[in-house]
C-alpha cells in the first residue's frame, strides 16, 4: 500500500465531504451518541486532550465547551477545515481549544503530552494503523486513556462486505476493525482495554459516489448484505453499522 497516496485520497474525499456540510452532518451527527461519549470519557479539570481525526470538530467543540479547565487540541489532515475550526473557536471565545494540521503519519507533539486521546469515525481511514496507535501511545502520558469510536463488521461478515461497500466512495477507507482486533493492536502499543459499549449508526451514501455498487452486491452473500439492513432509494443508499466504543489505558511506566 502507498501510505501517502492513501492519505491523499482521504484528504481529497473529506474536502468534498466537508464542502457538502448538510449531507456530511447527516452521515456523522448523532446527539444521543455524542452525549453518551461525553459521559463515558470522564474528562477532569487540567487534562490535555487530543481529538485525533477531528474533522469539523464534532467532539472537540463540546469537550472544550463543557470543560473550560482543560486544553483541547483537534488534529486532522484537512488543513482548510482546520482553518474553519480555528475561526469558529475564536468566535466562540474558546481559548482552551486549538486545531493543528499534520501529514497523517507522525503526530507533531512531544512524548507524554496528553492525558486523553479521543477519536470518532476516523481510524478506518488510517493506512498504517499500527504506526498511528503507536503514535497515540507515544503522546499519551503513562496512565492516560484512549477512546476509540469506530464502526465494526457484523459477526457474519467474514468476507468483509462492509469494507468493500465503504470503499465505493474513494475517500481512503481501509477497514473496520473488530473489538478483538483493536485489543490486539492496542495491546502491542502498551494500551489495555478497560471499558466499552456498542452503538449503531444509520449511514447514508450518495448513489452517484457509489462506484461499482451493483458489482459489490454480486460478490457477497445475500444474507450478509441483509444483516446490514441495506436500503436503496432513488438517490441514496442506507446501511446500519455497529459501532465499537472502547476505552483503553496506557500502561504505567
What are these model-predicted stretches?
Residues 1-43, 58-62, 81-84, 147-169, 207-210:
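Conserved class I S-adenosyl-L-methionine
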Residues 130-142:
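A short glycine-rich, Lys/Arg-flanked "PGG" loop and its adjoining helix->strand segment in the class I
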Residues 105-116:
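A short acidic, Gly/Pro-enriched loop at the edge of an enzyme's catalytic core
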Residues 116-127:
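A short SAM/SAH-binding and catalytic strip from SAM-dependent methyltransferases
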Residues 50-52, 56-106:
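Class I SAM-dependent methyltransferase SAM/SAH-binding core
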Residues 194-253:
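Conserved Class I S-adenosyl-L-methionine
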